[in-house]
UniProtKB/Swiss-Prot annotation:
<keyword id="KW-0413">Isomerase</keyword>
<dbReference type="InterPro" id="IPR012674">
    <property type="entry name" value="Calycin"/>
</dbReference>
<feature type="binding site" description="axial binding residue">
    <location>
        <position position="208"/>
    </location>
    <ligand>
        <name>heme b</name>
    </ligand>
</feature>
<feature type="region of interest" description="Disordered">
    <location>
        <begin position="1"/>
        <end position="24"/>
    </location>
</feature>
<feature type="compositionally biased region" description="Basic and acidic residues">
    <location>
        <begin position="7"/>
        <end position="24"/>
    </location>
</feature>
<comment type="pathway">
    <text>Nitrogen metabolism.</text>
</comment>
<comment type="subunit">
    <text>Homodimer.</text>
</comment>
<dbReference type="GO" id="GO:0062213">
    <property type="term" value="F:peroxynitrite isomerase activity"/>
</dbReference>
<comment type="similarity">
    <text>Belongs to the nitrobindin family.</text>
</comment>
<comment type="function">
    <text>Heme-binding protein able to scavenge peroxynitrite and to protect free L-tyrosine against peroxynitrite-mediated nitration, by acting as a peroxynitrite isomerase that converts peroxynitrite to nitrate. Therefore, this protein likely plays a role in peroxynitrite sensing and in the detoxification of reactive nitrogen and oxygen species (RNS and ROS, respectively). Is able to bind nitric oxide (NO) in vitro, but may act as a sensor of peroxynitrite levels in vivo.</text>
</comment>
<dbReference type="GO" id="GO:0020037">
    <property type="term" value="F:heme binding"/>
</dbReference>
<feature type="binding site">
    <location>
        <position position="181"/>
    </location>
    <ligand>
        <name>heme b</name>
    </ligand>
</feature>
<feature type="short sequence motif" description="GXWXGXG">
    <location>
        <begin position="65"/>
        <end position="71"/>
    </location>
</feature>
<dbReference type="InterPro" id="IPR045165">
    <property type="entry name" value="Nitrobindin"/>
</dbReference>
<dbReference type="GO" id="GO:0046872">
    <property type="term" value="F:metal ion binding"/>
</dbReference>
<dbReference type="Pfam" id="PF08768">
    <property type="entry name" value="THAP4_heme-bd"/>
</dbReference>
<dbReference type="InterPro" id="IPR022939">
    <property type="entry name" value="Nb(III)_bact/plant"/>
</dbReference>
Amino acid sequence: MTPAGDTPERGSGDRAVAEAAERAKATGARNIPVFDDLPLPADTANLRDGVSLSDSLLALLPLVGVWRGEGEGRDADGDYRFGQQIVVSHDGGDYLNWEARSWRLDESGEYHSPALRETGYWRFVTDPADPHETQAIELLLAHSSGYIELFYGRPLNQSSWELVTDALARSKSGTLVGGAKRLYGIVEGGDLGYVEERVDADGGLVPHLSARLSRYVG
């Protein structure tokens, strides 16, 4: 028997669908700017517009779009809040383009200074830990702070994905960092939420970043 407190509110599913349709009236009409004079398919962050998504990426389909919002970070100086935009686009190839930009916020929630920035690609590859059985997510990132990071992971379900650092390469000017674990998921209201933990000087995973971003495009 279902406890009274767990009973879904009557009509809640219909309202969720209606709210999603209302959001799509704005987000579904937008896309990222592109040059239209190139001879190859343009990047698109809107599944309604442009070239079709590769079948090999269907398990990552919910990520496609432009996402904006705020989050919380922690570094050697303490906790801080940041704003962020993530662009997830494709050109019909077997990978997703990824670009994330963030900026620190002051105590009043206004822009303070540039923060982390990363760009890279998501794709599915033969799982290096289980080459005969499964496909793994591969995420290759270049960070503006001077290092390249390779993640492998897997979908947890149709709308969440977990990744762990497999390798790091740092430039001479790059920030010294440890590996990370990331969890992304589509949460209530269709937002994109994520948490990142990084290995600290003591060798353990500690909270580093978390954010909840609303769909702006797609």
